[in-house]
Amino acid sequence: MQNEKWDFVILQEMSNGPITSKASFLENAEKLCEKIRENGAKPVFYATWAYQCGGKKLETFGMDYDEMYQKLYEAYHLAADRNHTLIADVGKKFYELSDKVNLYADDGCHPNEKGSQIAAEIIAEVLMN
């Protein structure tokens, strides 16, 4: 970031980091946003999705799908509000489509090709507007 100029820098936390380490997530989000702006770029939060409903990963995490989605949504939106940043809310779109389209890879955590396409479309829309 220091050696090149960027228009935007996309910030994505580990899948459950905004929930399991919320204070650290918010603190580091602020620091990163400051550094990004110092270099003339705009930070953008890439808000991720809950683990696949009914999947083993979600079961072992100890939350239901709605709860994980809500906590991720709240953490990412709080970080975006506090830091006055753009947000590419991919997690919200995954949630809206959860009972209509399979967006997950076999691990129930990462996106499949369709999920990746939707994520790319949302990010592009945020950056273009």
Predicted regions and their residues:
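Extended, basic/helix-rich recognition subdomains
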Residues: P111-N129
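Alpha-helical cap/lid subdomain in secreted, periplasmic
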Residues: M1-E113, Q117
